[in-house]
């Protein structure tokens, strides 16, 4: 009913719903999208955290996507946390190198989605979040930003900037 009402108010506005409705069905490397609202929405949208909540960034190299619904796709969230100025190996969580590596691998992976029409990295700037208590890393901040809370660009910012600059 909400989609119907929205279309009566503004028939030009596209409708989507960001869902995490994907699974590995029959294969550990094929992620299948299931969208219970597919018959209602104009855009398929889902959050994607392979390499952050699901394994390490190199896991992205193995993944392909199965999307049988013929609609445009927008990745509504993806990313990883990094504390500005914390450096180390690219496989060490919370370092700028880890976040940078995750962005590199994620962008290569999602570019293989035929219907991909847009992405929304999570998130541009670190922000206060009381549910982020990890001492000396989070300290009450969501650190998934590409820019630190004091305005400094993290390494992953430049990966995304380069990605956009190379798009036609």
What residue ranges belong to the model's regions?
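Substrate-binding clefts and catalytic carboxylate motifs of secreted carbohydrate-active enzymes
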Residues: 2-26, 34-168
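Non-catalytic beta-sheet/beta-sandwich ligand-binding modules that flank or precede catalytic cores
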Residues: 29
């Amino acid at each position: 009913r909400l989609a119907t009402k929205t279309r009566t108010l503004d028939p030009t506005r596209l409708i989507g719903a960001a869902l995490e409705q994907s699974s590995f069905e029959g294969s550990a490397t094929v992620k299948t999208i299931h969208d219970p609202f597919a018959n209602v929405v104009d855009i398929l949208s889902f959050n994607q955290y392979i390499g952050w909540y699901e394994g390490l960034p190199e896991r992205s190299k193995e993944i392909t996507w199965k999307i049988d619904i013929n609609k445009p796709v927008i990745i509504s969230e993806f990313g990883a946390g990094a504390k500005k100025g914390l450096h180390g190996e690219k496989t060490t969580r919370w370092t700028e190198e880890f976040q940078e590596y995750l962005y590199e691998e994620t962008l290569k992976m999602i570019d293989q989605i035929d219907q991909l029409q847009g992405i929304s990295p999570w998130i541009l700037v670190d922000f206060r979040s009381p549910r982020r208590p990890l001492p000396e890393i989070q300290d009450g901040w969501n650190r998934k930003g590409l820019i630190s809370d004091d305005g400094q660009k993290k390494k992953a910012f430049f990966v995304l900037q380069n990605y956009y600059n190379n798009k036609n």
